[in-house]
Amino acid sequence: KVVYEYIDDLNPHLAGTDELPVNVREKYEKTMKEKDSIVVVTADALQRDVLSKRGDSHLVFSCNGVDYNHFHNEIDPDFKFEKEFAEILEKGQPMIGYYGALAKWFDYQLVKELAETGKYQIVLFGIKYDDSYEKAGLDRQENVHFLGSRDYHVLQNYAAKMDVLTIPFLINEITKATSPVKLFEYMALNKPIVTTDMDECRKYQSVLIGH
């Protein structure tokens, strides 16, 4: 049998293009017609889409998860941070952290308004998925720090230094269908979590929804 993983909204922005790749569209349409194939979805919105097109035949709902041991038990208390990150720690202000893609679905305006309070150091790890970060002008905020990506094997050491971990996404068709892996990694770190009002984040009592 064919197993089709349906883990994101079919949106060209996720592919970094203006149009959805033809092969992606064709695989989706073929799967929606062939009810013998197994479809695995990770979010309620994706499940509703499948149900509307082919019913519940061979449909599996499986939200994302986490390597709990890696994020909870493999934090190195003697990890040597580079100077740039160490200097942020030395400022002594509460640190708000995010890691992941910086893309069109990221709420830059919200982060900018948070930075303008002057109460926090905001640390962003990840990749610039498109030109949205430059257009947002966050680099002009002295307390916003984009530090690039970090290897998965040491990422937990940086995240563990944050006072709050966040997922500040805009609410749109992409994020309505997102079950963020980082959400479960944040949980394993046992840190306060604040997100925007995403359906898949609302499911968990440990997540605070910002408005």
Predicted regions and their residues:
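Acidic anion/phosphate-binding donor-loop and adjacent secondary structure
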Residues: L14-T17, V66-E87, K104
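Nucleotide-activated donor-binding/catalytic signature segment of Leloir-type glycosyltransferases, i.e.
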Residues: Q93, G126, S132-A159, L208-I209
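Nucleotide-sugar-dependent
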Residues: H153-Y158, L165-M187, V194-S206
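Conserved donor-binding/catalytic core segment of Leloir-type glycosyltransferases
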Residues: F85-F106, V111-A115, K119-F125
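Carbohydrate-associated surface elements
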Residues: A45, S62-G65, E74, M162
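Membrane-proximal helix-turn-helix segments that form the acceptor-binding/catalytic region
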Residues: Y4, L10, E19-V39
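Short hydrophobic "strand-cap" motifs at the C-terminus of beta-strands
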Residues: T42, I96-G100, F125-G126, L147, ...
